């Protein structure tokens, strides 16, 4: 009944300390949006609840003000329709 020792590797936080959550920061927001344009869950993002709320509000603002579209056009251009 020996328990195998697995090496524990600490993951890097998805949002670095210098990054601000802002609706104009599209490169940050795209990391938290799926290929279908959906906001990824907090468990998949490994965010705190406060960070997830701020990300959600920023994505919704970006969709309305149009820096970020509702659907990700990059995934659509890679497949031929």
UniProtKB/Swiss-Prot annotation:
Is the keyword Chloroplast in the record?
Answer: yes
Does this entry carry the keyword Chloroplast?
A: yes
A Pfam family found in this protein is Ribosomal_S18
Q: Which GO terms describe its molecular function?
A: small ribosomal subunit rRNA binding; structural constituent of ribosome
Q: What SUPFAM superfamilies is this protein classified in?
A: Ribosomal protein S18 (SSF46911)
Tell me which UniProt keywords the record has, alphabetically. Answer: Chloroplast, Plastid, Ribonucleoprotein, Ribosomal protein, RNA-binding, rRNA-binding
Matching HAMAP family, A to Z? Ribosomal_bS18
Q: How does it assemble?
A: Part of the 30S ribosomal subunit.
Question: This protein is called what?
Answer: Small ribosomal subunit protein bS18c
Query: Which gene is transcribed and translated to give this protein?
Result: rps18
